Regions:
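An extended acidic
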Residues: 25-72, 146-170
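Bacterial N-terminal signal peptides that target proteins for export
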Residues: 2-13
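Low-complexity, acidic Ser/Thr/Pro/Gly-rich terminal tails and inter-domain linkers that flank the onset
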Residues: 68-85
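Beta-strand-rich recognition/accessory modules
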Residues: 164-216
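Bacterial N-terminal signal peptides
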Residues: 13-21
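Polysaccharide-binding surfaces and accessory modules of carbohydrate-active proteins
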Residues: 83-174
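Short beta-strand/loop motifs in extracellular/secreted proteins, especially
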Residues: 39-41, 102-106, 204
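Surface-exposed coil/turn segments at beta-strand junctions on protein surfaces, enriched
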Residues: 61, 73, 86, 187, ...
Length: 216
């Protein structure tokens, strides 16, 4: 059994690369919005006392891959690879970086689940109007978002890098990643935000997916 597990573990990076190499034409713009109103995922970075959202930086998109540059990390670049899931509303994301500064942190945020049909969004923030009735359950590096009417409750699940410091935050305060992370949980528009101490050359993985409606 141990030999089989070791063999499977060696093959895991190969299968991940295969999974992340398909569906290239389905990649979307930042921030990442799940269809059917199932939530918005926003990424940012923190360097010292400064922070910025990746959707406010220079973004070059090619298929399912994104290359992001900004003066905050000088000559470095951040790369995203996104793969939509085939059996659920969701996606897997790989985040990597090159020539990034020391003491660099990744910030991420998620919210705005309302089940509404896709509609035009006027800016890059997590839509506050869709956050009012979201309830979050956080367990380690994973979370579940509950939303919708009581008899038609829906869920969205997320898995983030182990070591993410996840907390409830105020969706009204998205001026910067640090502003959101330090905003506090007393709000009528809850979202979750997190900081992760990003090590040089480390690849990070996220997964967001939606299951069937909740049944009582």
């Amino acid at each position: 059994m141990k030999t089989t597990w070791n063999y499977s573990r060696r093959l895991l990076p190969f299968f991940l690369c295969m999974l992340l190499s398909v569906f290239g034409n389905n990649a979307q713009t930042l921030p990442f919005r799940l269809s059917k109103g199932a939530g918005t995922f926003r990424l940012g970075v923190v360097c010292g006392n400064e922070s910025c959202w990746l959707d406010q930086c220079s973004v070059k998109k090619k298929g399912q891959a994104y290359t992001i540059k900004d003066k905050l990390w000088k000559e470095g670049e951040i790369k995203l690879i996104v793969c939509p899931l085939t059996d659920s509303n969701g996606f897997i994301m790989e985040v990597s970086g090159e020539r990034l500064p020391e003491e660099f942190k990744l910030c991420w945020a998620f919210g705005a689940c309302d089940g509404a049909d896709d509609s035009a969004v006027t800016d890059n923030s997590i839509p506050v109007a869709s956050c009012f009735h979201n309830v979050f359950s956080i367990e380690g590096n994973a979370f579940t978002t509950y939303y919708g009417e009581s008899m038609k409750l829906r869920t969205v699940h997320g898995v983030s890098p182990i070591g993410s410091e996840i907390r409830l935050s105020d969706g009204h305060k998205q001026a910067s990643p640090l502003a959101l992370f330090n905003s506090g949980k007393k709000t009528d528009a809850p979202v979750i935000s997190a900081l992760y101490p990003w090590k040089p050359q480390e690849k990070l993985y996220f997964c967001f997916y939606q299951r069937a409606d909740y049944n009582y």
